[in-house]
Amino acid sequence: MQKNILVLGAGAWGTALALQLAYRGHNVRINSWKAEHNEQMLEDNNNHKYLPSIEKFPSRLKAIQDWQANIIEFDSILVATPSSGFKNTVLELKECILPQQNIISATKGFCHDSYALLSEIAEDILPTTKFALLTGPSFAKELANQLPTAVVVASKDINYARYVQELFSNENFRCYTTTDIIGAQVGGAVKNVLAITAGIAAGMEFGVNAHAALITRGLAEIKKLGLKLGANSETFIGLSCLGDLLLTCSDNQSRNRRFGLYLGQGMTIQQALKEVNNVVEGYFTAKAVYNLAKKHNVEMPLVFATYRILYEAADPRDIVKELMTRQLKNEN
């Protein structure tokens, strides 16, 4: 099943997925929204800016400048932009996408202005276009280096989910399917906020007891919000939630965890963002999750605490004391 795939978004994650598709035998073209970045990839045949460990792209992967003019060449479009650029990317696609083409999203987060799920944004703009989400515990560098990785493909259309599953899967990359696109998105987005929380705790040297408690209670918070939004309970113990939460909270390859680590060590927000020097999705997602939880009357103490640190200049040590001395309660 050889296909022609367009990848929009040439960060580390978009590039790693483009590499995976090329290794799988597909013809892949990748585009960055920055013209100079495209020129670098075309000239050097690599993406050293985001994946320096990959010396050269395989023969089936090349950069492309004017993707709109060449849209007819592609079977599927993979969107791997930051969440801030997702809506505008889909709006661009609306102007040129063909009826037989479909979309795969590798973006995690919520819409920054409406706090809607990204699938809702895509369905609103392109109501007749098939949509799937690829999510789960996966660092770009490890995938690019063909280390074993397992993820989930979520779509309301199980047949389309299976199509995407076949598109990506090989001996190094295993895709499972689900129709719970809400749960898969909530897990993949909120874990970025909790990774910041975990980083703050690590930066303050709180130890592994606190780390374990944070992941466990954080999972409970994700589940509460997800169920309120219409997700299935089983999704939250799978790869898209628990798996991704464990990965992102526990390893400094995570930009969100590193950002939190710097905050816990005493840096300001701006200093920490500058030190990470890349998009920290959890910083923006914290505001969306906070507002969604308030709207739906969902108690999320860890998320609320992280929001206060990020947006209300709360002192992390005061926040920890408040969390630990809240009214005692039953675990469930």
From Swiss-Prot:
Binding site for sn-glycerol 3-phosphate: 108, 136, 138, 191, 244, 254-256
The organism of origin for this protein: Francisella tularensis subsp. mediasiatica (strain FSC147)
GO terms, biological process: carbohydrate metabolic process; glycerol-3-phosphate biosynthetic process; glycerol-3-phosphate catabolic process; glycerophospholipid biosynthetic process
Broad EC category: oxidoreductase
Function summary: Catalyzes the reduction of the glycolytic intermediate dihydroxyacetone phosphate (DHAP) to sn-glycerol 3-phosphate (G3P), the key precursor for phospholipid synthesis.
E.C. numbers: 1.1.1.94
Protein name stated in the entry: Glycerol-3-phosphate dehydrogenase [NAD(P)+]
Pathway listed: Membrane lipid metabolism; glycerophospholipid metabolism
Active site as annotated: 191 (proton acceptor)
Keywords for the protein's UniProt record, in alphabetical order: Cytoplasm, Lipid biosynthesis, Lipid metabolism, NAD, NADP, Nucleotide-binding, Oxidoreductase, Phospholipid biosynthesis, Phospholipid metabolism
Binding site for NADPH: 13, 34, 108, 140, 255, 279, 281
